From Swiss-Prot:
Catalytic activity: guanosine(1516) in 16S rRNA + S-adenosyl-L-methionine = N(2)-methylguanosine(1516) in 16S rRNA + S-adenosyl-L-homocysteine + H(+)
Species the sequence originates in: Actinobacillus pleuropneumoniae serotype 3 (strain JL03)
GO molecular function terms listed in the Swiss-Prot or TrEMBL record: rRNA (guanine-N2-)-methyltransferase activity
InterPro entries found in the cross-reference section: 16SrRNA_methylTrfase_J, SAM-dependent_MTases_sf
Task performed by this protein: Specifically methylates the guanosine in position 1516 of 16S rRNA.
Organism taxonomic ancestry: Bacteria, Pseudomonadati, Pseudomonadota, Gammaproteobacteria, Pasteurellales
Annotated SUPFAM superfamilies: S-adenosyl-L-methionine-dependent methyltransferases
Family label: Belongs to the methyltransferase superfamily. RsmJ family.
Top-level enzyme category: transferase
Name of the protein in its database record: Ribosomal RNA small subunit methyltransferase J
Family annotation (Pfam families): SAM_MT (PF04445)
Keyword annotations from UniProtKB, A to Z: Cytoplasm, Methyltransferase, rRNA processing, S-adenosyl-L-methionine, Transferase
Keyword Manganese: no
Amino acid sequence: MTIQLINESSNTEKFQQICDKWRLVHDRSAILALVLTDERLELRKLDEPKLGAIAVNFVDGTMAHRRKFGGGRGEAVAKAVGIKGDYLPTIIDATAGLGRDAFVLASVGCKVLLVERNPIVAALLEDGLVRAYADPEIGAFMQERMILADVRDISLLDVAQQAADVVYLDPMYPHKQKSALVKKEMRVFQHLVGADLDSDNFFVPAKALARKRVVVKRPDYAPFLAEQKPDFSQTTKNHRFDVYLSHLKSA
């Protein structure tokens, strides 16, 4: 993936550390840019400046509103992973993206290990986590419940040491709509990472790591992951959560 690397901050050393850690190489011809400002790390689509920048922000804005006034345990993702009563499963979010579903789960009390294989997305996610860790309101529970894994692929996790109750998968899937109708964030993301065409390969390592269930979020029109029929599904207006119970145990 080609990207421009732009430092608009006063901290040149921090910018270089980010580039080195994620092995990012500047390409002046790229239309996507990863930009460090004094406030945050953000992604811009230079040929569509009206789209604005994409950054990870758990502290305020949409995500803070969702934490305070959203459905909490009643949200579809919370029901899909099996949250009930005092039961708060440990979770591996194997396709973490910008961490939004993971944040919902962490906000209601689950511990979530985040895995993200795209280095640019992982850099954005880490930046958002670092800022959240420093926040006086949510910092303590974020440090305890949302951790970015050192590995970029769930197949590299140690089944004996890092298994979780639930493995959650939300692979990118092509949108049916024309790009102009897809919200800005998804348009930029599709340009950055494309569809997860190899997402079927997630299924086997996910089953190995999940003690209770694997949950796969899909658009309502998408086929089952790896052509595997789930034990049951939960549906929302536009999506479907396919649930696979581990080793035929009750979840």
